[in-house]
């Protein structure tokens, strides 16, 4: 059933031993993936640890005529690896071998972007080439921090965020951990969400992957009942920042704390903006959708990343509603 082990566990591969002087999190052999190519089983694994020092992670390759080994390590290992802290992409590793219909080979792997660790692990693709002795290695003359030719011509441009205002829950948008279809409804680019909890921290906010260094979110909010709504940049329910607004008051949020920032004439409709300018977060609000006002708060969020907080999360923008 794919859920249990039958027979005795047998060790068949020891991994590739990288030089002792490399700075890693540990040996950490993981993520085996096998492809059968031209009479060989090619085994790609990750080593070095996903988080921690920029040079920690890597992807290594071995091959064997039999799935049971013995396994021969590639003389070109590691296939991908961050060798210097000055590189744009850190912790490169955990790769998969991919071939295209026209017979070309690529490696797809994840890495952190230097200076933007709070975006989480991002997906990269690089072309591979076959050596004369039958190994796959990175294609010479190609750098992962420069544009490369696409493997296959796109049939149409599909922007990651082009459908964002349609509130397609389960696609671009996802509730944090707890999902209930009874809690929301969508009609004509407007989403109605039932408030949950008494603060954004326990509200199970609705989030999406921003994937950008800098951006601004704007939302028009219409209240019913005693509710608070707003915009957040969310790592988890302990570590987040954001701005909230009720019919009469305004709030800012940092980690687990809530600060009241001001009050305004009671209204059932209000506009809110949250700006992330390369880790510097600020917010503004409007009572008419035209004149924008600013409260005295701002935050810096570069430290909200896995190396600091753990959990392999990232800062996700989104919206929340709490209260009744």
Roles of regions detected by a PLM:
Residues 1-324:
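Carbohydrate-active catalytic/glycan-binding domains of CAZyme proteins
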């Amino acid at each position: 059933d794919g859920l249990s082990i039958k027979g005795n566990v047998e060790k068949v591969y020891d991994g590739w031993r990288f030089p002792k002087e490399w700075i890693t999190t540990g040996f950490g052999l993981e993520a085996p993936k096998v492809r059968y190519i031209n009479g060989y089983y090619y085994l790609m694994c990750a080593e070095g640890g996903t988080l921690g020092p920029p040079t920690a992670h890597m992807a290594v390759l071995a091959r064997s005529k039999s799935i049971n080994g013995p396994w021969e390590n590639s003389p070109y290992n590691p296939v991908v690896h961050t060798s210097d802290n000055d590189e744009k992409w850190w912790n490169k590793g955990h790769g998969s071998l991919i071939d295209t219909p026209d017979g070309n080979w690529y490696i797809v792997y994840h890495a952190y972007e230097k200076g933007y660790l709070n975006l989480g692990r991002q997906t990269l693709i690089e072309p591979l080439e076959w050596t004369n002795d039958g190994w796959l290695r990175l294609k010479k003359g190609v750098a992962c921090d420069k544009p490369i030719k696409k493997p296959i011509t796109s049939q149409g441009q599909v922007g990651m965020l082009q459908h964002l205002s349609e509130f397609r829950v389960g696609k671009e948008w996802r509730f944090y951990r707890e999902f209930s279809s009874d809690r929301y409804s969508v009609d004509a680019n407007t989403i109605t969400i039932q408030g949950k909890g008494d603060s954004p921290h326990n509200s199970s906010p609705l989030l999406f992957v921003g994937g950008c260094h800098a951006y601004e979110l704007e939302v028009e909010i219409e209240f019913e009942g005693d509710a608070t709504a707003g915009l957040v940049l969310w790592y988890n329910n302990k570590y987040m920042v954001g701005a909230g607004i009720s019919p009469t008051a305004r709030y800012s949020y940092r980690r687990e704390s809530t600060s009241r920032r001001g009050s305004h004439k009671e209204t059932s409709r209000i506009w809110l903006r949250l700006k992330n300018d390369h880790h510097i977060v600020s917010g503004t609000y409007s009572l008419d959708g035209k004149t924008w006002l600013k409260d005295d708060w701002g935050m810096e969020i570069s430290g909200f990343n896995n190396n600091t907080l753990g959990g392999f999360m990232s800062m996700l923008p989104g919206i929340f509603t709490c209260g009744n």
